[in-house]
Amino acid sequence: MKQKPIDDELKYLDERSRDIFRHIVEAYLNDGEPVGSRNLSRLLRQTLSPATIRNVMSDLEHLGLIYAPHVSAGRMPTQSGLRFFVDAFMEAGDLPNEERESIEAQVKEAGHAQSVEHFLVQASQILSDLSRGAGLVLASKYEGTLKHIEFVRLDGQQALAVLVTQQGEVENRIVHLPKGVTHAQLTEATNFLNAHIQGRTLSEAKEEIARLCSETRAALDHLSHHLVETGLALWGGEDADHKIHLIVRGRSNLLEDVKAEEDLERLRHLFDDLETRESMAQLLDLTDEGPGVRIFIGSENKLFSLSGSSLVVAPYRDSQQRVIGALGVIGPTRLNYARIVPMVNYTAQLVSQLLR
């Protein structure tokens, strides 16, 4: 997509051309249909003949901002046209107080969930309900801070390692015990870990325990030391610190805009692509490239190249302002961007606050 030449020429669009273009896009965002010169003449503040409007539309089409979906039809914005509209015309102000209060109440209610994952599922559903699109959350597997770990002796040479986060999530792993480990040594290892992991993320706790183990080898007996080193490492397989999972709610909302079988196929491609680990990691990285909300229209991002969809997404952060996930709305390219952008931004801020 060669955007640069278009950008250069757009700087010289006169007020009349901008006004006609803006009305074409707004009509498309409202009903998804092309608009013709006769209808435009009734919408414009200026009194212009249909012939004059057609001449301007021809110039806009030459610039790649609008196109005719079929012969003798009106005009609709291209992907480049939508991008220009979002960048040059859209005013994404604050949400109305009533909507802010509604979102805040729903997110806080969801915050009472028993686990972080359930809370994020609820956040995804809230975005879907508010936008009438699909709500999306990308979540790092271990974004929570740790509360404690415990070793529970099982039969034979095995114990159950139980890791609990301050957000209420519980993870269990089986650990194989060295021969001769006593109950007292299990307790010693548990106490040592709990003295140093509380309030830290998993990756921070691992670094701290590794540092302490190298310094305190003489302070712990051999078997207790082995348990300490093994404890948090149980959660290190398959890059667990960076494992990302996808939560989507409201996929059926996207079907309301499907007008042909090929549209359905594009949506299938979208969700197939999103659910690959590489794509999710890429999308999470993109949200960290700049502050605030990111807008991806159509094929601007390769994840959406086949889908004809747009994504409005914002990161949510931990207490150290590190990006630990992202949430947003997927919908057709004719999303109500002016409403969706502040909605996603405010929801991301609330989620960040509740996860700290």
Swiss-Prot record:
Query: Record's InterPro entries?
Result: GAF-like_dom_sf, HrcA, HrcA_C, WH-like_DNA-bd_sf, WH_DNA-bd_sf, WHTH_HrcA_DNA-bd, WHTH_transcript_rep_HrcA_IDD
Keywords, sorted A to Z: Repressor, Stress response, Transcription, Transcription regulation
GO molecular function term, any single one: DNA binding
**Biological process according to GO:** negative regulation of DNA-templated transcription
Superkingdom of origin organism? Bacteria
Keyword Transcription regulation assigned: yes
Q: What does this protein do?
A: Negative regulator of class I heat shock genes (grpE-dnaK-dnaJ and groELS operons). Prevents heat-shock induction of these operons.
The protein here is known as: Heat-inducible transcription repressor HrcA
Tell me the name of the encoding gene.
Answer: hrcA
